[in-house]
């Protein structure tokens, strides 16, 4: 009887020790940052430069066309089930509120999935959001170039065998760009029209 009790005490003690070590190791191990955060939060890093892509009408779109306008830029893909449409809905609401406050701003959606997101697909998809949206795509090289300029990280998720049915993991930031095409600030899902207006007033 006493032998069984001692065995139980030893096992429980070992479990406590192992559990404690696991917690201590977890706390001491640096957490892996979210995609895109490694670069974007560094000081003095250059974000956003000139780019040229194809819009939802199949026309060449040069970023110089945004000169003279504030713009909000978001990177995503039309097959995204949740985060992308959430951001685009938020951007739609923000553009409406800013317009009501006499602040003109252009919403931009740049795909990270040019293989599936053709101009035709983008044109149909964006009907669900603000009519001022400009949707942009391009070839793989062009998309890689613009995502590098905005420090966006993205990668196809493993486990999808179908070449037309897959998911993409990616950074989720919305960029505020000034009238000269320069990066001002980036936001995450908590982006709001109020925050943008307050920020612009203090600029």
Swiss-Prot record:
PROSITE patterns: THIOREDOXIN_2. Cu cation binds at residues 80, 84, 170. The keyword Aminoacyl-tRNA synthetase does not apply. Signal peptide: none annotated. Keywords: Copper, Metal-binding. Residues 42-203 form the Thioredoxin domain. Coiled coil: none annotated. It comes from the Bacteria. GO terms for molecular function: metal ion binding. Belongs to the SCO1/2 family. This is SCO2-like protein RT0576.
């Amino acid at each position: 009887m006493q032998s069984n009790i001692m065995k139980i005490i030893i096992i429980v003690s070992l479990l406590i020790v192992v559990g404690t070590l696991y917690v201590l190791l977890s706390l001491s191990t640096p957490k892996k940052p979210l995609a895109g955060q490694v670069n974007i939060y560094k000081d003095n890093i250059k974000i956003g430069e000139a780019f040229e892509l194809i819009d939802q009408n199949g026309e060449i779109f040069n970023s110089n066309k945004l000169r003279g306008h504030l713009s909000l830029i978001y990177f995503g893909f039309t097959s995204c089930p949740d985060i992308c449409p959430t951001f685009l809905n938020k951007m739609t609401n923000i553009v409406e509120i800013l317009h009501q406050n006499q602040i003109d701003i252009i919403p931009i959606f740049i795909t990270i999935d040019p293989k599936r997101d053709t101009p035709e697909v983008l044109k149909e998809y964006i009907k669900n959001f603000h009519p001022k949206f400009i949707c942009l795509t391009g070839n793989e090289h062009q998309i890689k170039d613009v995502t590098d300029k905005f420090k966006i990280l993205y990668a196809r998720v493993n486990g999808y065998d179908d070449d037309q049915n897959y998911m993409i993991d990616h950074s989720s930031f919305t960029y505020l760009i000034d009238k000269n095409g320069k990066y001002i600030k980036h936001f995450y899902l908590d982006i709001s029209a109020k925050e943008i207006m307050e920020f612009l007033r203090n600029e």
